Amino acid sequence: METEMKILIGLSGGVDSAVAAYLLKKQGYEVTGTTMSIWDNFLPAPKTKVNDSCLGPENENIETAHKIADFLTIPLYVTDCSGEYKKVVLENFRNEYKEGRTPNPCIRCNAYIKFGILPAAVKKTGLSFDKFATGHYANIGFDSSTNMYKLYKAADLNKDQTYFLYRLTQKTLSETIFPLGIYTKEQVRNIAKKIGLPSAEKPDSQDFYCGDYNDILQFPANPGNIVDKNGRVLGKHNGIWNYTIGKRKGLGLLGGTKDPLYVINISAKQNMVTIGTKEDLYSSSLTAKKVSWCSILPPKKTIEATAKIRRQHKPEKAFIIPQEDSSVKVEFAQPQMSVTAGQSIVFYKDDTVLGGGVII
């Protein structure tokens, strides 16, 4: 083993990245930490605990990261990525909601900020390192038969984070280490407690932002109609960005209805929200664009795989059909509920992440 290899690890102040840093140091690597700063008080502070989300006041997290670095006796650099984060992640977040889509900012952040701008910014300071590591639950391997790096699911399938990592490139995979991929969350917690890490009891973050999304969107009211499938007006909305596919509560309907109703379509062009029954939420196919193949070359013909249309979605059998414009059509073996434009669909073959794209 190359004990002199230099590893830069992203330290969030949480237990996962702290244990990852500990494991790397224990294996003999020269470890340096970096903490990404993305908060510059451009929004009112969310009224919740700091560690409930990624985006929010981060003084406590940075302080904890320093304590972790001191505990592990490794250097720590705080890297300001707030400008890039606003431009790359938050502007896209606002634009997508304005168009009636529901984005996943964590996927975009991973692809462009955490695994791109963050390590690149540290390199610009003159610090040299061989690999970049994080506390994500995922695995990376090299397939000599295809001469390609592969992204694999984590051992702990309940904590597996590959859904958020499908946009990592071959170059990024070749430069990345995921020390926690072979561990369960319980094992990670136990390691943290056993060695007395400062973040051992810290709860997991729950979302990218724990306040009202309108804090970020800041759109003026734009009233429009809520209609049924036949175009009959059932109510009014103040902005399509307040709705997502599958939403049931707080729809703003004028009167009671016999059956539960759900949002089944959002049209930015018509400034209209369409509602229907639960049965109307099911789709047997979808189209995805901005497709990224992380572990294989772009397929030229139909492939069979399993697909997830959201983080908590159980992978379902599907056929991925490449299109001439580099998008893909996905046909499911069984209809799927709440296919949502703006969310990502991720393709798997057993434990291998093939790639994914953005649902349109």
UniProtKB/Swiss-Prot annotation:
SUPFAM superfamilies linked: Adenine nucleotide alpha hydrolases-like (SSF52402)
Residues noted as binding ATP in the record, renumbered to the chain: 10-17, 36, 135
Top-level taxon of the source organism: Bacteria
Active site: 109, 210
Pfam families in alphabetical order: tRNA_Me_trans (PF03054), tRNA_Me_trans_C (PF20258), tRNA_Me_trans_M (PF20259)
Any one GO CC term of the record: cytoplasm
Main subcellular location: cytoplasm
Region (Interaction with tRNA): 159-161
Catalysed reaction equations from the record: S-sulfanyl-L-cysteinyl-[protein] + uridine(34) in tRNA + AH2 + ATP = 2-thiouridine(34) in tRNA + L-cysteinyl-[protein] + A + AMP + diphosphate + H(+)
Documented EC number(s): 2.8.1.13
Disulfide-bond pairs as recorded: 109-210
Subcellular location: Cytoplasm
Listed CDD domains: MnmA_TRMU-like
Top-level enzyme category: transferase
InterPro entries: MnmA-like, MnmA-like_C, MnmA-like_central, MnmA-like_central_sf, Rossmann-like_a/b/a_fold
GO terms for biological process, alphabetical: tRNA wobble position uridine thiolation
Keywords recorded for this protein, A-Z: ATP-binding, Cytoplasm, Disulfide bond, Nucleotide-binding, RNA-binding, Transferase, tRNA processing, tRNA-binding
Protein family membership: Belongs to the MnmA/TRMU family.
Purpose of the protein: Catalyzes the 2-thiolation of uridine at the wobble position (U34) of tRNA, leading to the formation of s(2)U34.
PANTHER family assigned to the protein according to its UniProt record, in alphabetical order: MITOCHONDRIAL TRNA-SPECIFIC 2-THIOURIDYLASE 1 (PTHR11933:SF5), TRNA 5-METHYLAMINOMETHYL-2-THIOURIDYLATE -METHYLTRANSFERASE (PTHR11933)
Protein name: tRNA-specific 2-thiouridylase MnmA
Protein source organism: Endomicrobium trichonymphae
